[in-house]
């Protein structure tokens, strides 16, 4: 391959490296174009999460701060950290009088509202999402070369146009765009080696939504190793031992983190309601899986349990074998109510009928184990790309092995991995498998006919556009990987294409279940199909990404 020739810029440096930037990649046009679709969707379907946030507006508007985490008139109690409660309080102050009269700010058991409340809350999501656009524009603008800026633009545009955000925020109803915007601020601060800003933004993010604790181990190790520790040993061993900690840096970072958490939790400590707040944030009395199984290890485990139940019923010769292997109580299998309990995410303990019951302690141990495995290389090599890889694997571990994981939590994996995918073409395989399975797994959140065509068409167009866009800008690997790599790519693409019949089957069940009683009895089957198929895909993506993380050193340097 011939060496690339550079044209000299005004400063005497190669034009590709010249600081006088000539490019302009703006997200403004994308924001304007996407705004039209979001406004059209604003009057369509919304989930119960809409009334959740309406109730939080009412709580923070009508009650003193000391009552926010105690109020329980509605089942939709406030269970996000304080900064999100403050956000709802600020938002409530902008509610117009005609929206107030519509019932937006009334504390009631079940919200009674109409179009004015819907439009106000929909617009609040759209406006708050500006944080994501601004943070990603900063990410693009801070690129050092034209090639880097082009890659950054593809990455940024794929995130602001994410089918996940469209489904979860603008149809289902949540505020993830704003929160992931703060995550991007943290990520770009780390990229620019602004470690204090990195700690500041992540502390704020945790105080907005505690799901990002999934990523905390990677952030902690990165800041500790890159900013607070000095492990460059010299000749004088004794002096190095004394100076292994950069005390000034540690003090500055600790002060920022403590200050943020003090502002967030200080008022609740003062009013002595911290126990109630902690109980709201961490309700450990919930089951292993959510009502709709998130596509992770436990979805597959649950499906195997139900498969073994059917084998036990239909193949009598298998009964003594299953009893000997799994040592379960066969009396439970003849309890019709227990067997027909197709959802496992309701309040209470989770009991499997044949397979051993999974405890919260086991899920914590598995999550911690796989996170620690990802943290070791980060501690030894605290580069930005290694940090992003560790961040991705911490998200994977929490999503795949965590307790009571929601399907929406898969965005915690997608966002950090997206920032890495343009680094090396080998990452495209795990990435494509992840996003295709993850976004399809969100489809059951939107089960109405009016939005069916939108979610299918939007997902398909997004995947086609960014499949080729990322392929065009991605860095080629140093080795082609041989015939085995070709086979693996074909298997990945084949599995992704398998999502087409999966969606077709599920859609046909939706279409004809009102006509056929047998389909009504198999109502949970369509959720199981999506959870299991997408779960296998996401686990495969995790395996492929982990292999590259631990084996391919060239991807993770900052060169």
Curated annotation (Swiss-Prot):
Bilayer topology annotation: Multi-pass membrane protein
GO CC terms in record: endoplasmic reticulum membrane
Catalytic EC class: transferase
Keywords annotated in UniProt: Endoplasmic reticulum, Glycosyltransferase, Membrane, Transferase, Transmembrane, Transmembrane helix
Transmembrane segments: 25-45, 76-96, 123-143, 153-173, 204-224, 250-270, 287-309, 364-384, 395-415, 427-447, 450-470, 494-514, 527-547
Cytoplasmic-side positions: 46-75, 144-152, 225-249, 310-363, 416-426, 471-493, 548-559
InterPro entries in the record: Glyco_trans_ALG6/ALG8
Reaction(s) catalysed (UniProt annotation): an alpha-D-Glc-(1->3)-alpha-D-Man-(1->2)-alpha-D-Man-(1->2)-alpha-D-Man-(1->3)-[alpha-D-Man-(1->2)-alpha-D-Man-(1->3)-[alpha-D-Man-(1->2)-alpha-D-Man-(1->6)]-alpha-D-Man-(1->6)]-beta-D-Man-(1->4)-beta-D-GlcNAc-(1->4)-alpha-D-GlcNAc-diphospho-di-trans,poly-cis-dolichol + a di-trans,poly-cis-dolichyl beta-D-glucosyl phosphate = an alpha-D-Glc-(1->3)-alpha-D-Glc-(1->3)-alpha-D-Man-(1->2)-alpha-D-Man-(1->2)-alpha-D-Man-(1->3)-[alpha-D-Man-(1->2)-alpha-D-Man-(1->3)-[alpha-D-Man-(1->2)-alpha-D-Man-(1->6)]-alpha-D-Man-(1->6)]-beta-D-Man-(1->4)-beta-D-GlcNAc-(1->4)-alpha-D-GlcNAc-diphospho-di-trans,poly-cis-dolichol + a di-trans,poly-cis-dolichyl phosphate + H(+)
Entries under Pfam families matching the protein: Alg6_Alg8
Annotated family: Belongs to the ALG6/ALG8 glucosyltransferase family.
Protein name according to UniProt: Dolichyl pyrophosphate Glc1Man9GlcNAc2 alpha-1,3-glucosyltransferase
Organism classification: Eukaryota, Fungi, Dikarya, Ascomycota, Saccharomycotina
